[in-house]
């Protein structure tokens, strides 16, 4: 099986063309491939499939390193767009794809950045899903013997965003896994720790569902900005500084899609016998 290794700000992926290759990934195989000592090593596996709808170009599938399939990965979406052009699967700059729970438009810019229409953030608890009686801008949660104030949003996948004074000292390693599997998130969640530097600049660390802390989380950056705007903390255009680098997020508010712009890097091509 041929594959490519790619990354978006250090969030790394194994990307496989299932348009011209016949492939099947069991959870066990994915876990073996994800092992950084015995396999290829990655945060997520991205699979390019033929479209299910003639109006679309491809179907986009995402698997975490633990073998679980998820519906969204923003950094992966940028790498997906770069991959299909590099491999000659399309020469379009506007690439329309379906995911497990919707559709996306990926735009490759002239300077090889990728702009992703991530859709409109959904704050309804049932959409996340999150157990709550009604939608609130801020929720109170109990976790690890602490009272946590957080915002909750779906970007096609579940996110919880906590504001912290300093991301460098935030309890990502301890609080992240506790909140990820909190009973109020029946499908688990990605946990973002957000430091507001200015109204147009945040710092962010994300503990990803099924992957742990990563160098960058695209949908997590989108979620943090959406929650920050909803809570009145941020402007419509925000620079997000992650451990792996920078993303630019723009959202005009309810009724509008959110846009993420950032790099996608091709590292190498490989071949593996399964």
Curated annotation (Swiss-Prot):
BP-aspect Gene Ontology terms: lysine biosynthetic process via diaminopimelate
Residues carrying the site annotation Important for dimerization: 268
Record-level Gene Ontology MF annotations: diaminopimelate epimerase activity
Positions of substrate binding: 11, 44, 64, 74-75, 157, 190, 208-209, 218-219
Pfam families: DAP_epimerase
Keywords annotated in UniProt: Amino-acid biosynthesis, Cytoplasm, Isomerase, Lysine biosynthesis
Catalyzed reactions: (2S,6S)-2,6-diaminopimelate = meso-2,6-diaminopimelate
Keyword 4Fe-4S listed: no
Signal peptide: none
Enzyme class: isomerase
A cellular component term, taken from the record's GO annotations: cytosol
Assembly notes: Homodimer.
Protein name (record): Diaminopimelate epimerase
Gene: dapF
């Amino acid at each position: 099986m041929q594959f490519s290794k790619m990354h978006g700000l250090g969030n790394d992926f194994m990307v496989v063309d299932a348009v011209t290759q016949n492939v099947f990934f069991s959870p066990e195989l994915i876990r073996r491939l994800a092992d950084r000592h015995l396999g290829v090593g990655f945060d997520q596996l991205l699979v390019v499939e033929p479209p299910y709808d003639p109006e679309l170009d491809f179907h986009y599938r995402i698997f975490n390193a633990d073998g679980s399939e998820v519906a969204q990965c923003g950094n992966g979406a940028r790498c997906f767009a770069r991959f299909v052009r590099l491999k000659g699967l399309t020469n379009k700059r506007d690439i329309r794809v379906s995911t497990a729970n919707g559709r996306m438009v990926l735009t490759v810019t002239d300077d090889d950045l990728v702009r992703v229409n991530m859709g409109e953030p959904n704050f309804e608890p049932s959409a996340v899903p999150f157990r709550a009686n009604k939608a609130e801008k801020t929720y109170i949660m109990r976790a690890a013997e602490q009272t946590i104030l957080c915002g909750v949003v779906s970007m096609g996948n579940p996110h919880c965003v906590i504001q912290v004074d300093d991301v460098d000292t935030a309890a990502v390693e301890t609080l992240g896994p506790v909140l990820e599997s909190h009973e109020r998130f029946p499908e688990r969640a990605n946990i973002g720790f957000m430091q507001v530097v200015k109204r147009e600049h945040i710092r962010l660390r994300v503990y990803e569902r099924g992957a742990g802390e990563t160098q960058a989380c695209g949908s997590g950056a989108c979620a943090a900005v959406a929650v920050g705007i909803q809570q009145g903390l941020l402007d419509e255009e925000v620079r997000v500084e992650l451990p792996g680098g920078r993303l630019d997020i723009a959202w005009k508010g309810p009724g509008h899609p959110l846009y993420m712009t950032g790099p996608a890097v091709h590292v190498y091509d490989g071949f593996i016998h399964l």
